[in-house]
Each structure stands twice: as C-alpha cells, then as structure tokens.
Amino acid sequence: MSKPPRPNWIEDIPIYRQLMELVVVRILDQIYLEDKMLPSVRQLAQDCDVNPLTVAKAYKELAREGFTDKYRGEGLMLRKGVRDILLRREKTRFMKEEWPVLRSRLKRLGIDLRTLAETFND
C-alpha cells in the first residue's frame, strides 16, 4: 500500500490539532482501521515530517477522546465503533458549519439541486 500524501500545514492551527484531524480523515477513509494499530509515533512523525513529540501530543488527545487504547510496548489501537462515531460527528459538523455556507453560495450562483446532482455522475 502506498503512503498517503504529506499534509500541507496551516500556519494558524497547532500542528498537533492538524495531526488529529489527519488521523480522523484517515480513519474515515479507512486507511486506519478499527481494532488495528495506528502507525507508531516515530513512523507518523517521519511520514509527516514533524517532531515525534507533536505526534505524541496528538495521539494523547485522541486517547483522551476515547478513540484509542494503549498497549504497552505495542502502541495505540483504534477502538471498535470509532469510525461510526467520527462519521456522525463529521456529518453533524458539516451540516451545521459547512452546508449553510455552501447552500448560500449555490443559491447565489443559481446552481439548483438537479445541476449539482448531475456533477456526481462525472
């Protein structure tokens, strides 16, 4: 399996937060699977070209949110059901934060639902 591309960091957001979001995206995209080990701190740090302490902080926050279990000497494993939880959370966030902006822009541009739906077939 090929490596996912390195992220482009946003200057105004702490890197550990962006790493958390990266892990969430990779869970949703099923790159990281439930009941499987996450990449080691060193591996993810190397893949993303960041300090291992930054990855450790991101992993600590994910554990605090209840998404992982730590196995001494082995690493972190994603808990069963995490993807469904994250999917619900991301859908809710999209509908509250992103959809109203997108909907407003579609209206402004005169793009109706039929036209929008046709683009999904491309």
Regions found by a protein language model. Give the residues of each.
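Beta-hairpin "wing" of winged helix-turn-helix
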Residues: 31-32, 36, 63-73, 79-80
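A general secondary-structure boundary signal
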Residues: 52, 60-63, 76, 113, ...
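Short, cationic-aromatic polyanion-contact patches
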Residues: 16, 40, 76-91
